[in-house]
């Protein structure tokens, strides 16, 4: 009986702890569901790309990194991805100081490969089973598309949510600035 009572108390304590942690994340989140902010060190993770290669974020220190959280069912993602491809990836893909990874939220590799074909993007796409990488950056139940720009020092320097042309232009300009390149409008 004593063992049963102790086990029950332990389960209640764990449940309360998990709920408190979830409540704390919700309280910390901004109105876009982000739980990370400009100036924060970007949470580390390892992602498996569709080609089987594994990439750990911390191994990219010293580079400017853009994370694009996406999914095949996201209409806004489908709208934004061709612009990411043409205005960011094609411009910087050969720059060794830059990395872009699309992180597909909780879909199997076959779906992600089909999604790549439909959108026509060539930048790396990674798999996020269970949305566990996503949950390091935003509330698990919050929506996508969202982009996180990370500086060479590993700190977040910009976050976007949904596809807004003015905000996207600022993202492009910020990447160019971080890489020491001029935007097309500044030539």
Where are these regions (language model features)?
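N-terminal targeting signals for export/organelle localization
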Residues: 1-44, 186-187
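A short beta-strand-turn-helix
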Residues: 36, 45-65, 137
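Short loop/turn microsegments at loop-to-beta-strand junctions
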Residues: 42-43, 65, 144-146
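Hydrophobic beta-strand anchors of alpha/beta hydrolase catalytic cores
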Residues: 66-67, 100
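Structural microenvironment flanking redox-active thiols in thiol-disulfide oxidoreductases
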Residues: 78-119, 130-136
């Amino acid at each position: 009986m004593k063992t049963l009572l102790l086990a029950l108390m332990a389960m209640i304590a764990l449940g309360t702890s998990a709920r408190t942690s979830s409540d704390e994340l919700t309280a910390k989140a901004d109105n876009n569901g982000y739980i990370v902010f400009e100036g924060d060190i970007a949470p580390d993770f390892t992602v498996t790309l569709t080609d089987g290669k594994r990439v750990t974020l911390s191994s990219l220190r010293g580079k400017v990194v853009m994370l694009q959280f996406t999914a095949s069912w996201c209409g806004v993602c489908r709208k934004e991805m061709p612009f990411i491809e043409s205005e960011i990836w094609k411009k910087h893909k050969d720059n060794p100081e830059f990395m872009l990874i699309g992180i597909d939220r909780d879909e199997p590799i076959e779906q992600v490969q089909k999604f790549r074909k439909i959108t026509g993007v060539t930048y790396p796409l990674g798999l996020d089973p269970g949305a566990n990488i996503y949950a390091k950056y935003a509330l698990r139940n919050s929506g996508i598309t969202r982009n996180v720009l990370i500086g060479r020092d590993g700190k977040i320097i910009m976050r976007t949510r949904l596809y807004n042309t003015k905000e996207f232009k600022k993202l492009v300009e910020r990447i160019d600035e971080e890489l020491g390149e001029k935007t097309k409008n500044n030539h």
